[in-house]
Regions:
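Active-site loop-to-helix "anion-binding N-cap" substructures in soluble metabolic enzymes
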Residues: 1-259
Length: 259
C-alpha cells in the first residue's frame, strides 16, 4: 500500500495459543517463506512464556516481537503480572494494550489502558492501543462518541513528541464472533474518525503520521481490500497469525500498490 506519511504495520496477536517449542517451529517456518524486500513493519505478539523463544528465533530478522499485555507498575507485589521493563529486557518491541478481551474478561478500564500506554512509552515499547464498540453501542448510534472517549482517555498525558510511537487498533467488537461482518467501507469510516480525533488532540501532522490498524478478523482473503482503504494502515491479526503461510499472504497484500 502507498503510505506516504506513515508505516504499514501487520501485527499478529496469538492470544493463548502455542507453546515455546511450537513458537520455535512456527518462526523457523515463517523465516523460510518470508517475502523478500518487504517494507511493512511486522510484529508478532505472543504469550509471555513464548517471548524468549520468539526473540531468539527472529533475532536476525526485521520481525518485531511483542507481548499481549503488561502491567503499568514498575515492580512490586503484583502476582502473575509482567512489567514493561521485563518485556523490554526480554527483547520485546511491541505490546498490545486494551484489547477487547482484556476489557471484557478482566475489567480493564480506560484508566488502566492509559496507565499502561504511558508505562510502555516510558520503557521504549511501541504500544498497540485497542479501541472499539459493541453491537449495542453501534445500534444506539454512539460509535463515534464511545471510541472518541476511549482514545481521549487512553492517550491522556501522552506528549506530542511521543504520539507517533503509538499504534491504534480498531476492533469492531460488534462484528467479532457475532456472524456480522464489517465491510471495508465501515472499517474505513471508523478509522478515518479515529484519525480526526488524533488530529484534534494533537495536530494534522501527527494525525497523518500515526498508524491505525484494523482488528476485525483480517485474514489472507480480505486483507488487500481492507488495506486499500486510505485510513487503514495495517491489521491486528488474530487466528490468521497462527499460520505462517497466512501471515506471509497478508504481508504480501500489504506490499501491493493500490489503484
Amino acid at each position: 500500500m502507498n503510505r506516504k506519511y506513515r508505516k504499514t504495520v501487520i501485527a499478529g496477536n496469538w492470544k493463548m495459543n502455542k507453546t515455546p517449542s511450537e513458537t520455535k517451529e512456527f518462526m523457523t517456518q515463517l523465516k523460510a517463506i518470508m517475502p523478500k524486500g518487504r517494507w511493512c513493519d511486522v510484529a508478532l505478539c505472543v504469550p509471555a512464556v513464548c517471548i524468549p523463544a520468539a526473540v531468539r528465533a527472529m533475532r536476525e530478522t526485521r520481525v518485531g516481537i511483542g507481548a499481549e499485555n503488561c502491567n503499568a507498575k514498575a515492580s512490586g507485589a503484583y502476582t502473575g503480572e509482567i512489567s514493561t521493563a521485563m518485556l523490554t529486557d526480554a527483547g520485546c518491541k511491541y505490546v498490545i494494550i486494551g484489547h477487547s478481551e482484556r476489557r471484557e474478561m478482566y475489567g480493564e478500564t480506560d484508566a488502566d489502558v492509559n496507565a499502561k500506554v504511558l508505562a510502555a512509552l516510558e520503557a521504549g515499547l511501541i504500544p498497540i492501543m485497542c479501541c472499539g464498540e459493541t453491537l449495542a453501542q453501534r445500534e444506539a448510534g454512539i460509535t463515534a462518541e464511545h471510541i472518541t472517549m476511549q482514545i481521549k482517555l487512553g492517550l491522556a498525558g501522552v506528549p506530542e513528541e511521543k504520539i507517533r510511537k503509538v499504534v491504534i487498533a480498531y476492533e469492531p467488537i460488534w462484528a467479532i464472533g457475532t456472524g456480522l461482518t464489517a465491510t471495508p467501507e465501515q472499517a474505513e469510516e471508523v478509522c478515518e474518525m479515529i484519525r480526526s480525533v488524533v488530529r484534534k488532540l494533537y495536530s494534522s501532522k501527527n494525525a497523518r503520521a500515526i498508524s491505525i490498524l484494523y482488528g476485525g478478523s483480517m485474514n489472507e482473503k480480505n486483507a488487500f481490500e481492507l488495506l486499500a482503504q486510505p485510513d487503514i494502515d495495517g491489521g491486528l491479526i488474530g487466528g490468521a497469525s497462527l499460520v505462517p503461510e497466512k501471515v506471509v499472504k497478508i504481508i504480501e497484500a500489504a506490499n501491493q500498490p493500490t489503484v
